[in-house]
Curated annotation (Swiss-Prot):
One of its GO terms (cellular component) is ribonucleoprotein complex. It comes from the Bacteria. PANTHER family: 30S RIBOSOMAL PROTEIN S10 FAMILY MEMBER (PTHR11700). Gene3D superfamilies: Ribosomal protein S10 domain (3.30.70.600). This is Small ribosomal subunit protein uS10. Involved in the binding of tRNA to the ribosomes. It comes from Lactococcus lactis subsp. cremoris (strain MG1363). PROSITE patterns: RIBOSOMAL_S10. GO terms for biological process: translation. Part of the 30S ribosomal subunit. Belongs to the universal ribosomal protein uS10 family.
Length: 102
């Protein structure tokens, strides 16, 4: 029989909020006696945007902005119904994107 696994992928712009959300998920899963693998840090996406400072000329004067997307992966192996229910009721901080695959 194949083992069931829940894969949770978290994304956020701030790594402190992301780590706090990951810790809450791991604590909740361990409280219900589920085996947890993670949080595994995934590579950070970095987007750099270059903008000309002046409106009409002075192309040599530019400003760069960057956006970093931090990611974490958590696997919950052999989850019970109690684990799934407690994860659904979990209140996570705003600013964290959550993708769940069964």
């Amino acid at each position: 029989m194949a083992t069931k696994k829940i894969r949770i992928r978290l994304k956020a712009y701030e790594h402190r909020i992301l780590d706090a959300a990951a810790e809450k998920i791991v604590e909740t899963a361990k409280r219900t006696n589920a085996e947890v693998s993670g949080p595994i840090p995934l590579p950070t996406d970095r987007s750099v945007y270059t903008v000309i400072r002046a409106t009409h000329k002075y192309k040599d004067s530019r400003e760069q902005f960057e956006m970093r997307t931090h990611k974490r992966l958590i696997d919950i192996i052999e989850p019970t119904q109690k684990t799934v229910d407690s994860l659904m009721k979990l209140d996570l901080p705003s600013g964290v994107n959550i993708e769940i695959k069964l």
